[in-house]
Amino acid sequence: MDIIFYHPTFDTQWWIEALRKAIPQARVRAWKSGDNDSADYALVWHPPVEMLAGRDLKAVFALGAGVDSILSKLQAHPEMLNPSVPLFRLEDTGMGEQMQEYAVSQVLHWFRRFDDYRIQQNSSHWQPLPEYHWEDFTIGILGAGVLGSKVAQSLQTWRFPLRCWSRTRKSWPGVQSFAGREELSAFLSQCRVLINLLPNTPETVGIINQQLLEKLPDGAYLLNLARGVHVVEDDLLAALDSGKVKGAMLDVFNREPLPPESPLWQHPRVTITPHVAAITRPAEAVEYISRTIAQLEKGERVCGQVDRARGY
């Protein structure tokens, strides 16, 4: 069994050694331009077209939860990957736990009005504010995949009313489910906090725009943990300036790194993190990949395969 590995920033040598240890029967090598030798599996992140084109692979693993970079490259270069080759993404591998930490900490930050107190502090103003009540602080999760379910589970501990929206209806205990475009407005109408965990597909690009934001209750909050292209940034800024949206926590952006001239940097109601909400944990990723390859070799059914038509 031959495995090729490519990631522009990861510690390649660590990964190769870890994979060799986890899959002793495999010959693992770092792919470099000009390497056309045979391979059974490819582990990649933002791979060059030539790495995958023309190869008779058993599977490709994207080294992250998102596969939009591969799928967008496939649109421009369909010869890059045979349609019959299954494409897998890392399903959780510790990212769910990180998303839980990030989401819960920020929801509680808003719930306890720490954002308002920070603004008061900046002007040396001492004024206790009325508290929010959990039963009136409905949290909506936009996108009900693996990470969305993890976030919902963690928020249930705090007794917040929870709802989710996705393409198809879900049956999560204690979570009100909405499905399809026809139910999006009803979903949004009660969301004091909107957490975006949608996949990046042509249908979801720009979905968080003026029309969507207007359907939220006045003074709602936005937490974007998915992709920057989901948000029309000018529309969000307008909603923040008008008070329609009271605050936004943004981990992802249309352009990354976020340009210094972006007005998001200086907006008093915006908090920014540099795409760190959930990162790949190498040891857990290696364990998932080795387990999945073993299942594939045995002809067993596996989880995490991407539906290329849907984009996730």
UniProtKB/Swiss-Prot annotation:
UniProt EC number: 1.1.1.79, 1.1.1.81
Q: Where is the major localization of this protein?
A: cytoplasm
- Cite the PROSITE patterns for this sequence: D_2_HYDROXYACID_DH_3
Alphabetical UniProt keywords: Cytoplasm, NAD, NADP, Oxidoreductase
According to UniProt, the reaction catalysed is: glycolate + NADP(+) = glyoxylate + NADPH + H(+); (R)-glycerate + NAD(+) = 3-hydroxypyruvate + NADH + H(+); (R)-glycerate + NADP(+) = 3-hydroxypyruvate + NADPH + H(+)
Molecular function (GO) terms for this protein are: glyoxylate reductase (NADPH) activity; hydroxypyruvate reductase (NADH) activity; hydroxypyruvate reductase (NADPH) activity; NAD binding
Q: Which residues form the active site?
A: R227, H275 (proton donor)
| GO CC aspect terms | cytoplasm
Q: Which SUPFAM superfamilies match?
A: NAD(P)-binding Rossmann-fold domains
Top EC class for this record = oxidoreductase
Instruction: Read off the InterPro entries from this record.
Output: D-isomer_DH_CS, D-isomer_DH_NAD-bd, GhrA_Enterobacterales, NAD(P)-bd_dom_sf
| Compartment annotation | Cytoplasm
Q: Which residues constitute the signal peptide according to the record? A: none
Its family? Answer: Belongs to the D-isomer specific 2-hydroxyacid dehydrogenase family. GhrA subfamily.
Q: Function, please? A: Catalyzes the NADPH-dependent reduction of glyoxylate and hydroxypyruvate into glycolate and glycerate, respectively.
Q: What is this protein called?
A: Glyoxylate/hydroxypyruvate reductase A
Q: Which gene encodes it?
A: ghrA
